[in-house]
Structure formats: C-alpha cells, structure tokens
C-alpha cells in the first residue's frame, strides 16, 4: 500500500502543475490522458448491434472504458487491469501467459482459471466453449467503441455465466480508413488497420491486426538454466462487419471474424496455437417509444494445440511431457422483447440457448520425443433459459428500482474418457451418464438520486455450470497432476452490495461495499504431494470495498481506483486443509491511478500506475507471489489532421511482476519494460 500511495503522489504532482499551465496555453501544453467511466445513460456505441440501455443498467454498478485504439502493444486484458477488482488468473498478458490460464473474475471470486465473469462481444459470449478461458488476443484486431464493466451477479439478460459480473465489449464500425504501425523492444511489431464506408443502404467495415515479437525469457533472472530462452509470439486477426437498414427503425447486422495466436513458454516443446472463427447474425428493431426487439444467432469454432514440457532439476535439460489438441464449438441464439407499455419500455423479456461441445486429444508418457499413451475426453452441455426484468422510476432524479429474474434448464450430455497405449491395449474406457437440472437467478436493485448524490443497493443470486474442461480433462504441470471430476455440481452465488456516488463540477466519487457467498466453488484441491483434483468446495466468502475517484484538472483528468477484497475458503472433508485460507490468485489489495488528456490539442498522452498486492499461488498458501507496482506511459504528437506519431512504454520501472511460482520455487515473470514508437493515420 505504501508503494501505491507513493505512486499516487508522483502522478498527482505533475497533474496539478498541468492544471496551472493549461490556463496560460491549453493548446500547446503537453498533458496526459485517462480513461474515464461514464454513466449508463450517456453510453452511445455506434454499430454495437444492441438495444438502447434499459433503466436497470443505471442501478447496477457500472464502469465504462473508452479510448481503445488498437496497436502500440495495447492489450485489452491490460486495459481491464486499470479497474481495480477485476482479477485475471495470471498477471501476465496474452503475449506470454498460457492460453488456458486466461480466465477472469471479479470481487475475489477466484481460485480457478475458468472465468466467473461473463465476457461478451456485442452480446455474444466469448469464453472458450471447452475450457472457459478467454482468448484476449482475438479482440486486439477489433475496432472497439467501449468496454462496459457491470459488477455483481444475477443479471437475467446476460445469462447464467455472469456469476461475478459482465464485461461487455462493444465494437464500432469505421467510417473511412485508420491505420497504425509500431516497432518495439525485442524486435516487436504491431500493425493494425480498419476500413469502412457506405454500401448501398448500409455500411461495411473490415478490421485487421498483426503483432509479433521475439519475446522475453519468462523465468526470472538468477533462476535460469540452459533450457531457458525467450518466448516469441505471433498473433493476428481479421474481421468483417455488415450493417443494413431494414426500414421501420430496423437493421440487420452480420459479423465474421477469425484470429490466430502462436505463443511459446520459453523452453522447447511448449508452443501453443489457437485458431478461431466466429460468426453472428442479428436483427434489431429499436424505435423510440414503441415495442423493441432483438434476435441473435451465433457460432464459435476453436482449435487449440499446446505442448507441455518437463524441465529437469537445475534447468539444464527438457523433455516433452504432453501434447494436447482441443477442438471446440459454441452455438447460441437469443431473443429479447421490450413491449410498448409506457415511457421507456420498462419491461424486458427474452429467452436464450447456448450449446458447447468439445474434447481434448492428448499424447503423453513420452520416451524421448515419442509418446506412449493417448487420451481423449470430452462431452457437451446445453443451457436454455428465460428472463424478465422490470424497471420503474426516474433514472435522473428520485427513485429508480429494478427487479429481474431468470430460470434455466441445463443438460450435460454423456461424457467420456478413453486412454490407451499407442499401438496397444486400452487402459481406461469410461462413459459418464448424462445429467440435467434447473437453476434460478435474479437481481433486485434500487437507486435514489438527488442533485449530485446517488445512493444504491442490490441483492442477487447467480450460478455457473462447470466447463467441459473441469468435468472431463485431467492435466499436468511439471510434476503436479490434477485429475478431472465428472460429478462436479453447478456453482451458486448469493450476494449483495450498497453504494454511494457523487458527481459535481468535474469531480466524481464512488464507493461500493459488497458481500458474496459462492457455494459449490470449484477449485483444485490437493489430495497428496503432486496430486490434485477439481472439487466443489463448501463455499468461498468474499467481502470488500471498491472505490473510485475522478477529477478534471484543466485539459486532463485524474482517476484512481482501489479494491480491498477479503476472501476466504469454507471447506470440509478432503478439502478441510483449505478452510479459512484465501483463494489462490486473489490479492487483498489492488489499485490504479491514471492520468489522461481529454482535449483535441496537438499533444497528448497518458500515464497509468497499477498496484497489485501479494497473493497465493496455490490452494494451501504455501507459495506466495509478491506485490508489484508498474507504470505505463505514452506521448503523442499530431502532425496534421491525418497523421500522428506516438511513443509508449510498458512497465517503465522494469518491475519484476511474479506471474507464477513452481513447487521448486522457480518464478515466472510478466512483461518486463517494453518501449514502442510508431505512427497513426486516419483518412
């Protein structure tokens, strides 16, 4: 905490100075930029393919990130770290982290790499259909108009995956041409382009991005051996969006995008490859003062390959341990209706369906580079739900309340796990009976607003179905083996929060107290040395406070966020050794301070200071990841209306950010200091 407060002071002093300088010469002052949240009623996202915000959006705790220009090493997952309380399973980003570790959650509901927060792109769920991790690199190629972060569970419209909250990505359609190119440390390149314009009675836009780099050595200095080397990456994506007016305030939108992600973990036999193709089609009827509706259908196809290595003591030799391929498919559809009852259509009703299928195909028990055994495991899941939400009152002044409910029926198809010696006998041939059940979720919220002050409160219930990965796939990391558990039950959340907001004359303050009880929480439980199993814990209890403050200072805005999270495991039986411990990968303290310019002068920039506290690497708290304070900053100079040049830096302190630690004490680090320089153009 002392390190964070010191960093706040460092940013605040130049901010105050800039506020003085701006009075004399605001057109030429070099100022810093920040990303600020905006109230739900101000959100306007072009081409998002969704209905206008409802009254219920104003009751939920919401933050919005804007200024999401791609390129120059900008990563969506790192921008999310600007908001305290958003927790990603690993501190490393999509250039070096293993793809299966990139889950996301909120409010201390962690300890598991599967996402407990729902991530959507224009309303389409984005978590991997098999594993629940999020392919963050896929969104760097998309021209995003904003990210809406809704905290807390129980949202009927978002679906059952929104256990801890929803992170909604919203794309926008380019009108003209924009492009950027940058060169960075370790021979890194990052290029992006977007082209869009009118097509008949509609619009068309094409977005693309390519990035690559030689990478850095993941193992911390002083612990490296002969097998350790830099971990290169190569990533790219291409997207096509079409939008046509269908008359009578209706439009049809189609989206097709694909991405490719190649990474390495810094030793031989650890290359991973992820390829994906997504398509969606929607029809939106959104007149003001009349009935509104939306129909959406989508498909997601993923193909993931990864190698895993076994490194000998002393790190002087390495051998293949496992090769894995995971093909998976997600299908879904949604329909929402807002009848014309009165005012701004206070009633929302709808239904949705989601299906996931996938399997893991693995080769292991290597002799040299030849595998001796093959395993295939997988299954399918379906969820069908219906929801309703009613909002009443005045979002701008007085009392506003909302009540939502949802009921879901879920199915787990027959699962399977087959293991055999390659070219020989069958070792395991298991079939797991199909299961099904019903779950309910809901949310009640109220907000009272008077002039600059708002008070709010909410209570909610949500749930999450185990992923196919958690149910059927055992895995190994080094000497650590984790077995699957086909009998896992759905996770269920009860929670509540109270908060206060104040806004006046360029100043915004917000504070939220929350408490959550997650029963049946799925975690990796240690059974014996080097042997774990996924199990339902009795519960994870998490309570804490989230605070944000924002101040306009001349042509700049200063924003700070802080989250205190007190999370503990409630466990018995085989997991009793975890009782009272903090969940793995959850820090008690986290915060950020950002400063960004917000005018149209020729000079601009940003500075973001992030702090993350100590956290446990493992379920028993035997391995601890130290805290870290990092600084990102950048400056831009607009040469004319079309062209600007920029320089950016990541982790300018070159802080050691521990991302993982093995049982033998070997520390994996996140991104070290990285510098970028390049140009942007728009026509």
Region roles according to the model:
Residues 155, 168, 175-178, 182, ...:
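Periplasmic-side early beta-strands and strand-to-turn transitions of outer-membrane beta-barrels
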Residues 124-151:
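Short acidic/polar hinge/loop motifs at secondary-structure boundaries
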Residues 32, 76-79, 102-108, 120-122, ...:
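N-terminal periplasmic accessory domains that precede
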Residues 77-124:
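Extracytoplasmic beta-strand/coil segments of soluble accessory domains associated
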Residues 39-74, 98-103, 117:
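N-terminal periplasmic "start-of-domain" segments of outer-membrane beta-barrel proteins
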Residues 301-305, 357-366, 409-426, 434, ...:
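Surface-exposed extracellular loop regions of Gram-negative outer-membrane beta-barrel proteins
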Residues 271-286, 322-330, 378-383, 429-449, ...:
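Outer-membrane beta-barrel signature, preferentially recognizing the C-terminal barrel domain
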């Amino acid at each position: 905490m002392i390190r964070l407060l010191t960093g706040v002071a460092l940013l605040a002093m130049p901010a105050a100075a800039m506020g003085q300088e701006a009075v004399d010469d605001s057109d030429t002052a070099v100022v810093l930029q920040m990303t600020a949240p905006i109230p739900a009623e101000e959100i306007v996202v072009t081409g998002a393919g969704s209905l206008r915000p409802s009254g219920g959006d104003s009751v939920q705790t919401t933050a919005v990130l804007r200024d999401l220009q791609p390129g120059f090493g900008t990563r969506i997952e790192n921008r999310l770290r600007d908001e305290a309380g958003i927790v990603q399973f690993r501190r490393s980003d999509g250039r070096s982290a293993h793809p299966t570790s990139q889950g996301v959650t909120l409010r201390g509901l962690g300890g598991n790499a599967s996402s407990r927060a729902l991530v959507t792109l224009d309303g389409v769920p984005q978590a991997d259909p098999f594993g629940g991790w999020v392919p963050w690199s896929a969104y760097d190629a998309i021209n995003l108009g904003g990210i809406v972060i809704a905290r807390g569970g129980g949202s009927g419209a978002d679906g059952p995956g929104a256990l801890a909250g929803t992170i909604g990505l919203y794309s926008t359609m380019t009108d003209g041409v924009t492009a950027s190119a940058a060169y960075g440390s370790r021979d890194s390149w990052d290029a992006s382009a977007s082209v869009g314009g009118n097509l008949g009675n509609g619009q068309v836009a094409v977005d693309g991005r390519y990035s690559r780099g030689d990478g850095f050595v993941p193992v911390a200095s002083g612990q490296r051996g002969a097998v350790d080397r830099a971990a290169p990456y190569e990533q790219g994506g291409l997207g096509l969006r079409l939008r046509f007016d269908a008359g009578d305030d209706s439009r049809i939108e189609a989206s097709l995008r694909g991405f490719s992600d190649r990474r390495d973990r810094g030793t031989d036999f650890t290359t991973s490859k992820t390829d994906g193709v997504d398509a969606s089609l929607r029809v939106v009827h959104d007149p003001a003062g009349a009935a509104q509706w939306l129909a959406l259908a989508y498909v997601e196809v993923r193909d993931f390959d990864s190698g895993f290595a076994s490194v000998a003591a002393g790190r002087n030799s390495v051998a293949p341990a496992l090769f894995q391929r995971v093909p998976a498919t997600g299908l879904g559809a949604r329909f929402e209706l807002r009848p014309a009852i009165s005012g701004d259509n206070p009633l929302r009703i709808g239904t949705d369906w989601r299906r996931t299928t996938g399997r893991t195909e693995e080769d292991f028990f290597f002799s040299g580079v030849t595998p001796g055994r093959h395993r295939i495991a997988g299954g399918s899941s379906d969820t069908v739900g219906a929801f309703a939400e009613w909002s009443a009152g005045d979002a701008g002044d007085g009392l506003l309340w909302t009540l939502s409910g949802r009921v879901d029926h879920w199915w787990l198809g027959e699962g399977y796990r087959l293991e055999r010696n390659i070219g020989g006998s069958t070792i395991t041939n298991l079939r797991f009976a199909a299961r099904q059940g019903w779950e309910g979720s809901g949310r009640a919220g109220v907000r009272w607003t008077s002039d600059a002050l708002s008070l709010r409160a909410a209570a909610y219930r949500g749930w999450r179905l185990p992923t196919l990965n958690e149910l059927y796939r055992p895995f190994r990391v080094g000497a650590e083996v984790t077995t699957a558990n086909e009998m896992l039950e759905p996770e269920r959340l009860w929670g509540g929060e109270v908060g206060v907001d104040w806004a006046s004359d360029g100043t915004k303050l917000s504070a939220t107290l929350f408490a959550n009880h997650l029963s049946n929480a799925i975690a990796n439980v240690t059974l014996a040395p080097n042997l774990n199993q996924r199990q339902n814990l009795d519960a994870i209890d998490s309570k804490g406070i989230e605070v944000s403050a924002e101040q306009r200072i001349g042509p700049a805005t200063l924003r700070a966020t802080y989250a205190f999270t007190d999370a503990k495991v409630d466990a018995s039986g085989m997991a009793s050794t975890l009782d009272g411990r903090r969940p793995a990968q959850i820090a008690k303290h986290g915060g950020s301070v950002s400063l960004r310019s917000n005018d149209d002068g020729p000079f601009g920039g940003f500075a973001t200071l992030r702090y993350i506290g100590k956290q446990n690497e493992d379920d028993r708290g035997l391995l601890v990841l130290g805290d870290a304070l990092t600084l990102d900053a950048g400056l831009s100079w607009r040469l004319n209306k079309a062209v600007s040049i920029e320089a950016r830096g990541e982790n300018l302190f070159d802080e050691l950010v521990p991302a993982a630690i093995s049982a033998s004490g070997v520390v994996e680090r996140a991104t070290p200091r990285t510098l970028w320089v390049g140009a942007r153009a728009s026509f």
